[in-house]
């Protein structure tokens, strides 16, 4: 299929069918994932995923995906914010514009990015700030994601630094904003624009055109997206087409009112006493997840069960992953992979369990990082109105049968 015609196909095959059919029992698999069902209708370039919406596309990866350091492209979650996505993209004509407080306003074609700039790779976790939002009680606003609004990929592209150097920064340039091709239905609705400080730009921030050795999947931002390793995905702008450099921070809806948490020591509030002062969500918390087994898995008494999963943080580095089978009274170290994918990537882990007794068995995992941070128990996580940055100790419950 031509990439530029992708979404016409998607709207026909997935859009009209997914929402119209996945509400019926016949259109869902019997494959529960944390009490959620994977649709049996797949979007193009994707295997069946947990579907929340087709416009904009909101697709969650099933728990079973999280057993290796890299997430396959066709199982990678999808999160768009605005409902209108181009149905036609011609890669030969696509370009990204750089303007604002620069010495030279420029437009750089996709071809030029690929042929005239140094190509670099970075492996990094992409995670929605609202991942696992459904765990917050009372329920918060936003998509009620389960555990799978995240993935890890090897991204290839060009350094943001190099693109800005090509344009040349004007004196006093302080901020840089990013806008993509997703649009709202009404003109009054703000574009989804995110900003970062120029002083915080480092070599691992790239404009990516490849994901796991292939062109970006259409639903993951083809043909170009911003990659900001270590921070939540709200700023990883998809279908990136416009970069604006400014001397002052702009007034932007999606910076001023969205993806923000209480600006206090606990980053917390209560439904009856919302925080007056807030700050953007940025660096990811230390986190881990069991990919296998899953809740409801049946295993044979006397067998050896290998627990597998992943751990990550905002780039400080995972130090340990530990497993408990006694509700957290005691913990044992899992085996971590060699970490060769880099500090922003998943660390895959494994742990061998000998199943000596039949019955229900709960398995917990928690990660710690080199900064000294450790996952808390779910009951110790403080509430915030957006349901952001959840990183509670993970648990699955299996049945050991004689």
Model-derived features: positions:
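Short, structural beta-strand-to-alpha-helix junction motif
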Residues: 155-162, 197
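Acidic/polar N-terminal loop/beta-strand segments that form early-domain functional surfaces
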Residues: 99-103, 111, 129-131
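Generic beta-strand or strand-like secondary-structure segments
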Residues: 98, 127, 159-163
């Amino acid at each position: 299929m031509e990439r530029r015609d992708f979404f016409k196909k998607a709207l026909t095959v997935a859009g009209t069918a997914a929402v119209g059919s996945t509400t019926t029992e016949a259109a869902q698999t019997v494959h529960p994932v944390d009490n959620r069902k994977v649709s049996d209708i797949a979007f193009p370039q994707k295997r069946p995923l947990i579907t929340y919406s087709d416009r904009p596309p909101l697709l969650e990866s099933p728990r079973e995906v999280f057993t290796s350091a890299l997430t396959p492209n066709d199982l990678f979650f999808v999160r768009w914010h605005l409902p209108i996505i181009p149905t036609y993209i011609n890669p030969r004509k696509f370009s990204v514009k750089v303007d604002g407080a620069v010495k030279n306003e420029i437009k750089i074609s996709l071809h030029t990015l690929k042929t005239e700039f140094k190509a670099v790779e970075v492996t990094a976790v992409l995670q929605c700030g609202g991942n696992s939002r459904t765990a917050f009680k009372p329920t918060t606003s936003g998509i009620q994601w389960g555990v799978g609004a995240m993935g890890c990929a090897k991204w290839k592209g060009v350094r943001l630094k190099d693109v800005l150097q090509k344009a040349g920064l004007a004196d006093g340039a302080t901020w840089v904003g990013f806008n993509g091709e997703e649009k709202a239905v009404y003109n009054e609705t703000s574009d989804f624009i995110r900003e970062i400080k120029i002083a915080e730009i480092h070599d691992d921030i790239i404009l990516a055109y490849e994901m796991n050795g292939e062109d970006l999947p259409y639903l993951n931002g083809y043909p170009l997206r911003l990659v900001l390793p270590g921070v939540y995905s709200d700023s990883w702008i998809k279908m990136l087409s416009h970069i604006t450099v400014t001397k002052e921070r702009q007034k932007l809806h999606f910076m001023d009112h969205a993806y923000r948490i209480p600006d206090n020591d606990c980053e917390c509030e209560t439904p009856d006493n919302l925080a007056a002062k807030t700050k953007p969500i940025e660096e990811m918390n230390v986190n881990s997840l069991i990919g296998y087994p899953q809740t409801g898995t049946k295993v044979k008494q006397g067998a050896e069960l290998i627990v597998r999963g992943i751990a990550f943080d905002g780039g400080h580095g995972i130090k340990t992953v530990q497993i408990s089978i006694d509700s957290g009274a005691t913990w044992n170290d899992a085996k971590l992979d060699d970490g060769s994918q880099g500090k922003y990537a998943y660390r895959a882990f494994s742990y061998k369990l000998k199943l000596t007794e039949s019955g229900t068995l709960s398995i917990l995992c928690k990660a710690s990082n080199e900064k000294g941070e450790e996952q808390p128990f779910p009951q110790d996580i403080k509430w915030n109105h957006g349901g952001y940055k959840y990183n509670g100790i993970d648990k699955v419950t299996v049945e050991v049968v004689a």
